């Protein structure tokens, strides 16, 4: 499944946070969560992450793990090609 995560930093990130994030991404990859794209953004959210996970439960586990650093809103994403097939 593909997800879009919207995140707001709880505090100003520093170099240690960036290094910790790199390590955590590798740990998630070993658990089957694959980061497809990651952007720092301007506006209501500080970051947007597009990732794959096996299920909603796995995506929720990831959100819980990072809740000390960021608040998140996670969306389930359906590729356009698949969504168009649902239109009658």
PLM feature spans:
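General N-terminal targeting signals
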Residues: 20-22, 26, 50-52, 68
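Short beta-strand-to-loop capping motifs
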Residues: 7-9, 49-54
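Short S/T/G/P-rich N-terminal loop/turn motif that feeds into the first structured element of a domain
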Residues: 1-30, 34-36, 41-45, 78-88
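An amphipathic, aromatic/His-enriched active-site/gating alpha helix that lines ligand/cofactor pockets
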Residues: 52-83
